[in-house]
Amino acid sequence: MRTDLLRARLLEALTLKELPRAGWVREGVQQPESVAAHSWGVAWLVLVLCPKHINREQALCIAIVHDLAELRVGDITPHDGVDPQDKAARELAAFSALNTGLPVDLMPFTQAYGNTPEGRFVKACDKLDMALQAQRYGAIQGLALQEFIDSALAKLEPGLLRELAAGASPPEL
């Protein structure tokens, strides 16, 4: 294993801490969360809300890497007008490059996102995180972010995650 390449990949991944979420920037959120903060939020939801029939460890791994490709392609949102297939191809190419030089193969985790029971659960937690963050920013900064909540609700199945996303207002922060 080449330690110089491994070190480069580890350092590059840390840049997710500085990459702001594009949707929040577009809406004028002050000090928007980073992609890394979002990934932590998704992992937190997976850890706390994981049902018994889902492999928690696998779901956590998927949650941690689900937006890793954004290091190279940026945080592409539906408002950017990028064809979803083109976005997926860009992200796959970026992820493949980022996966080289690591002591573990991360490709199965990114391929599972949305495509296995664990991956679908993580994707649902991704939408829940967006809705909860919209509620939080709306309460703290007085912004109208209902479109983010509505987008999440449109993609969430009935049940606990949808109920949490639909919350009328967050508790006192």
Regions of interest found by a model, annotated:
Residues 1-173:
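Active-site helical microenvironments for divalent-metal-assisted chemistry
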